[in-house]
Amino acid sequence: MIGSPDLVAFTKETDFSEITTDSSVLPEDLSVPMYPYTGDATPWSKISSAKLKKDFILISEFSEQVGPQPLLTVPLETKACGTFDLNYFSLRIMSVDYQTSLAGSPGYGSFKLNFVEDSKVVLADSREGVFAYVHHLTLYDLEARGFVRPLCLAYVSSDENKIIQQFQRISTEFNKVSECLKTGNRKNFANELEVKLRDLEYTRVVLQKELNTVSVKCSSEREPILNGVHSFERNADEVKLNEKSSHTDEISPQEKDGCGNSRKVEVKLENENRSHFEHEQYGKQRKDKPDKTSCPMPLANKNDELASVEKLIQDYKSLLKQVTCYPTRKLRDSEYSPYEPDDLPQSFDLDLDSQFAGPMLECSVFTYTNTPSQTLQQINSTSSSRFDKRLKTLEELCDDYFYQQALQQLYSIERTFRGDACYLYTQQLCRNLLRNLKSTNFLFEDPCDLDDDVGLQIGQSTIQQPSFLPAPSFLSGPVSLESYASCVEMVPIKLELGGSSQSQVQHSTLNTPSKDNRPQVADKSPAEVEMKGEIISAPDCQGNVESVSNLMKTSISSGDSIEVLGTERSFRSQGANTLVETAMHRPPPLSSATALEGLKQGRVPTRRTCSEDSIEVLCITESISPDELRASYPCAIDEESPEQETDEKNSSQYQEDNNEKSIYVQGKISADHENACLKKLHPSVTVTPPDCPLTLEETSFQDSCQATESATMLLLDEPSRMVPDDLSDCFSYRSTTASTTSECTFPACLPKDKREGGTRRRRGRVGRAALQFMRQFPFAVHAVFSLLSGRTLVVLGSEEAAVRRLVTALSVYLPHLTKYKDSIQPWTSTPLQLTDLLNWKLIGFDRMCSFNPSSLPHCLDHYSRYLSILDVDQKTLHCPTYSGSLINLLVEPKSHFKRGNTYFTFAQSVQSKLVTKAFLLTFSHGHPSPSRPQGSSGTECFLSELHTDDKKILRYLSELIKLHFMEVTPNVLLFSYTTTSIFKL
C-alpha cells in the first residue's frame, strides 16, 4: 500500500519556499481599503436608500375618525417628500401614545384636563431608510373625544448623525413651536368654552320658561277634570240615598202584599244597569279625548333635562377654570415671549331673565371680550353621532397669531438645519469659539455668527408681528398707565414734593394728561392724527409738558397699590421693548423750541411716602427728576427739526473751512479742531412719549444704537409709513450733520437674517462678488489695504447696480468699527461731510449728482487727502500703494477659488490671523520676554520685522480693539500724509 500510485502528495512549489515581506508596507490590520469612488458619491456622504430629496418637517395627528394622518409638511410635500409615503410614516410615528393622560370624558362624573409634558423620541424606519426626531404634544378640542387631539412634530432626515448631533438644538427649537401652538390652542379652547357656556345658559333659561309654562298649563287643565269627577260622585250618592229610602218605605206593603215582590226586583236591576251604563260612557269619553285632559310633555322629562344642563354648566365652568389657571410658561430665551391670553370673565352666573326678549338672544348681552359676537343657540340634549361631526383643522385649533408664529418658526428651523451634518457641526463649533473671543470677534465676523441660534429668532426684542396679520389688541389699543411695569411687577409708588406732606392725585392717563389742554383729536389714535395732518399748537404742547411733569411727580396710587414708575436702570431694560411697541403710532413732532423749554428743568426734590402696605422704591438716588422717569413711557426715535439741522450744517461748514487752514502734525488733528468736532458731535437723541416730544441727553451709545436698530427694523416692516428722515444718518453715533436722503440704506438697520453674509446663500453671493472684483481689477490689493488701514474708500459710478455690487464685494474686507453698527453706505447722492468720513468707511457715491459728471465731484476732490476713490466708469483707483505681505494671499488675482462660500471662508481665516496679531499687539505690553532686548518696548519688538504698510494695518485693528474694549466709539479722524498713486486698467 505504501507504493500505491493512488497516494499523491498534494503540494506546491511555494509551500517550502521562504515568504518575503516588504518592510515599507503597513500591516494588514492597519491598512485602509480604497474608497470605491463614483461620480455621485463623496467620501463624507452616507449612501442611503431613502426616497427623500431633502430634509423636511412633518406635522401629524392621530385622528379619532380616520387614524394617523399627515397634516402639514415644511416645505411643501411636492418639494421635499418626492415618493416618500407620508401616510405610512405617520402611522409609524403615531403608533405609540406618548401623551397618555387621565382626562375625563363626558361619561364620567366630572371633567378634568391633565396638561402633560411634551415627549421627545428619535425613531428609525428601516423600510424608508430615514430617521426622525419626533416631538409629541397634545392640543385640546371641545368636540373631540376626551377633549384631546394628539399631535406630533417630526424632523425627518436621511442622515442619522445630523439628528443625533443636533438633538439638543432641534429639541430646543421644537419646544418653542410647541409652546406657541399650545398657548394659541388654550386661548381658542377657552373661547370655545365661553361660547358653550353662553349657549348652556341660554338653554337653561329656555327650559326654565318652558317648564313654568307646562306646569301652569297642566294645573289649569287638571281643574275641570277634578270638578267633573266630584259632580259624578255626588250624583251617584244621591241615587244611592234615593234607592235606600224607597227600599225602606216599601218594606211594610211588601210584607202585606207578597204579589209585588217581582216588580220591585225589576226596578232595582234597572237602576243598577243605568248606573253601569253611565260609568262606561264616562270612561269612553276620557279615552276619546286624551289631549284635552293630559299635559303635552311629562314634567319629569323637563326636570331631568334641566338638571343635565345645569350639570354641564358646572362641568364646563370647571374646564374653563382649569384652562385659564394654567400658567403661560415663559421660555428662557428673551426673544420668545408670547403674550398672555386675555383676562377671562370671573363669573358666568348672569341674569338672563331680564334680557330675554324672544327665541334668539344676541351675545352682546354678555360682557365678554374674548370671542366675537354671535347668536346664541339652544343645545339639544340628544347628541348626534360622533362620526357625523367635522373635526377642526390645526389652524382652527390655534389662535391665528400663534399659528402663524409657529409656522414662521418651523420654516426657520428647516432653513437652519438644511445642509450637511459636517457643515452644521463646524458652524456650531465656530460659534462656540467666537463666543469666547468677545474682544476681537466684532471686527470681521458677521453679527449673525455671534448669536447662539442664528435664524431661529422670531424677533429681536419681542415677537415681530407678521405683515400678513393684524396687530394684536395689546399692540393696537391705546397706551395706558397699567400697561407698564418695572423691576417690581405692577407696583405703583406715590411720590410727593419735598415741601409738602401730601400730594394731590391726578386721575388721568398718559394719553389725556389735562382736560383743559386736551386737543380736539385726543379721542383718536396718534396714527389717525398724523394721517389727517393735524398739528398740536405750541401752547397746548407746553401745557402737556407741564402736565406730564406733574404726572411724573405725583403718580396715580391708592392705599393698597404700589407702582415703580422709573429707576436708573429702567431705560436700559425697557427702552428697546417700548420702542417696538409704540414706534408705529407716535404723534407728529412738535417744534424744537417747545421741546427745549420742557427740558430746561432742574432736579426737583421729591419725597416718597409709604402707606402700611407700600414698598420703598428700589432707587439709590436722593431725588428723582422727570428726565429719569421718562424711560417708563413709550418712546420712539425722532430727529431734530430741519431748522436746527440746517443751523448745525452751516456752523459745521464754517468750522471745516477754517480748520482746513490749520496745520496737521504726525497725522493728528489739532486740538482746536478736535474740540470743535467733539462739541459739535455731542450725542442727542429725541425721545417721544405719547403726548409731546422730550429730549433725553447724554444717552449711552449702546442703548441708543439698540433703540435705533429696533425702531428702524419696525419701520422697514411697513414701507408705507416710512419717511425719508427715518433712514437718515442721524442714526449713526456722533453724526448730526450728515446727509439726509431717502436713498440711504443701512445694513445695521436690516434684520439679522437679511444682512450681507447672514446666511449661506448670501455668503456665497458676497464671496462670488469678491472673486469677480479680484479678477476684474488686478490692483484690488491696494483697495483692500485702504479698508484695512482705516482709510475711507469711495466707489464712484453712474450706475447704481454696479456700484452696489462692488460695495458688496468690498464689504468682505471691511473691519467693523464697533459691534453695534456697520460703517457701509452702499449708495448716496448727497455731498459728503467731514463727519461722514468718521462714520462711513465704505461709500457708494453717485457720479451724476455733480454739475460735471465727467470730472470728480467737488466734495470728493475737497476731501481727496482722506479718501481712496475707485472709479467704476473709468476703471481707475486713486489710493496709496501697498507693499507689504500680510494680505497678498487674501487678494490674489490668480486664485483658483470657484465657489463663493469657499472664498468667503478662506477670507475669514486670513482675517483671523490678522486679528490674532492685532490682539497680541494690543495686550502684550509689559510682559517680560527673553528674546526682547533691554530698553525696547514690546510694540517695537513685535513690529520690527513687519513692513510699514503691514504696521499700519495692525495698528488700526489694534486701535479698534482698544476702543471696543473701553466701549468708546471713534471720535477723532486720524490720517497721515502719504503719497497716492493712480492705477488704471
From Swiss-Prot:
Pfam family, one: Folliculin
One Gene Ontology term, aspect cellular component: guanyl-nucleotide exchange factor complex
Region (Disordered) residue spans: 242-301, 502-528, 639-659
Any one GO biological process: negative regulation of autophagosome assembly
Location within or outside the cell: Cytoplasm; Nucleus
Recorded superkingdom: Eukaryota
GO MF entries: GTPase activator activity; guanyl-nucleotide exchange factor activity; protein kinase inhibitor activity
Location of the uDENN FLCN/SMCR8-type domain: 47-225
Residues covered by the cDENN FLCN/SMCR8-type domain: 390-895
Polar residues composition-biased segments: 502-514
Principal subcellular localization: cytoplasm
Compositional bias per record (Basic and acidic residues), positions renumbered to this chain: 242-292
Keywords attached to this entry: Autophagy, Cytoplasm, Guanine-nucleotide releasing factor, Nucleus
The dDENN FLCN/SMCR8-type domain, residue ranges: 904-962
InterPro entries: FLCN/SMCR8_DENN (IPR037521), Folliculin/SMCR8_longin (IPR037520)
Keyword Flavoprotein: no
Assembly: Component of the C9orf72-SMCR8 complex. The C9orf72-SMCR8 complex associates with the ATG1/ULK1 kinase complex.
Function description: Component of the C9orf72-SMCR8 complex, a complex that has guanine nucleotide exchange factor (GEF) activity and regulates autophagy. In the complex, C9orf72 and SMCR8 probably constitute the catalytic subunits that promote the exchange of GDP to GTP, converting inactive GDP-bound RAB8A and RAB39B into their active GTP-bound form, thereby promoting autophagosome maturation. The C9orf72-SMCR8 complex also acts as a negative regulator of autophagy initiation by interacting with the ATG1/ULK1 kinase complex and inhibiting its protein kinase activity.
Name of the protein this chain belongs to: Guanine nucleotide exchange protein smcr8b
Organism: Danio rerio (Zebrafish)
